Amino acid sequence: MLREVSVTRELNVWLVKQVDKLQAPLCQVFVEPFSKPWVLLADPIEAYDIMTRRPDFDRSNFITDGLSPMDNFHARMKTGPQWRTTRAWLQDLMSPTFLNNVVGPVMFDNSMNLIRFWETKTKLANGSAFDVNDDLDHSALDGMLSFVFDRHFEHTALGPQIETISRIAPTSLAVGPRGEVRFPRAPVHEFISALYETVDKIDVVTKAMSPKLAMWFIRQTPSYKRVTAVKRQVVKEQMQGALQRLEATDEPRTAIEHMLVREKKAAEKQDRKADFGNHIMMDEIAGQFIAGLHTTSTTLAWTFIYLTRLQHIQSKLRDALHQACSDAHAEKRVPTLAELTASRVPYLEAVLEETLRLHATSVARQAKRDTEVLGHRIPKGTNVVMIANGPGFHAPAFDVESARRSATAVKSKGWRETSDMRVFDPDRWLVHKAGAAVAEVEFDANAVPQIAFGMGPRSCWGRRMAYLELRLVVCLVVWNFDLLDVSPELADPKASYGIVHRADQCYLRLRGRRTL
């Protein structure tokens, strides 16, 4: 394993090879030294059952250890009182009111900022491709900054890049060996840099043979201590500003303000003094940026990679968007936020879901007590890793006898399976709308299994927010640009598995559509 994964950086690929080798929906592999073996589960029905209905499973220590650079962030906690406390702080942030009135407008403005930046880059590149991975990271982080912190936090990730690009001449751009244009990178504020460094450390810990040992070494380094101090200092300053605004208006607006109000209400209910300065809340606030960074930017990168490779799907998506926002298309303008969110576009949903399906990372749960999976004994403390890129997800499922399933899993029905489950095909998510007078399709979220966000009570907390950002960015990019073909060596980047399945590069060759 070490030899292969050190070269490919694709642990999930190695795991699914073990499943294919044994041709069994349940097998065990030894991954971490001096630890129990992992149990690999390659069956979406049983995986769904474990995540949603089985109380004998909880957050895996693979995740709690892997996310340890985030310190007290809720995603690395076992289910218990402290996890419930932190989740209660976040209760308002996924409400329709907050998403529609706060997140939506700032995400739209942020996406348009990215569009304008790419228009400048497109002119400078003069028909050549350029890597947008960093741009997508910066844009995702700026989106979070704009509603977690107050607008008075003037620092952004994309801003310095825009300023730097505005001052360069096309003749000064470096050109890579494959004809790609290389734009210079500008330094960012120390808080933003600290967030990126935390993400890098998560990647190191997750991929280490012994995550706990790797994290112990990281904690001893001056750089980690500096990063932690910077994050907590900036968050503390923002919390103090939020408290002052709440005293003046008593009306929460930003994410921090909503969290502080929730802590105040909880303290009143429990007859205690509100603890606004605790490190758990500080780490939770900083963790919001990190959790929403690579997850959305990585999905966007893969989406644009597929749309570049598959021009017919790109055209079909653009046609669907033009039809959904027909007034904006007829008036040759960019649709407004209200127009983009007025109705769901089935084909857009299908494109996003297909990207998530093909690049989901495996989900792990840990047995809280001795239990069984598919008739096999699972001892307490065992990590069960649900393979997201194997049989049942990227290939036809194994035939499992009902007698081997749990009582709740027996009642579950399977999904539509085809021989091309490794192929990017959004149409697999569309079904004919029942009772429609004309041939009309609708998006079926349950058409095919995918577990990119996990499922059940420990699924991704920010799922709704992520979908909102994905829809807005993809809509606006496809509306404003043609994603032209790039050379084969740029169209098929290498990738690595960590917390996310991240492409090393995302090369785009853009042509503006504003005048088309």
Predicted regions and their residues:
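C-terminal helix/juxtamembrane-tail motif
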Residues: 501-516
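Short, small-residue alpha-helix embedded
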Residues: 295-308, 473
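N-terminal membrane-proximal hinge/A-helix region immediately C-terminal to the signal-anchor transmembrane segment
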Residues: 1-76, 81, 85, 108-113, ...
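Cytochrome P450 I-helix active-site segment
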Residues: 309-361, 379-382, 419
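Conserved cytochrome P450 K-helix E-x-x-R motif and the immediately C-terminal K′/meander segment
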Residues: 4-20, 334-374
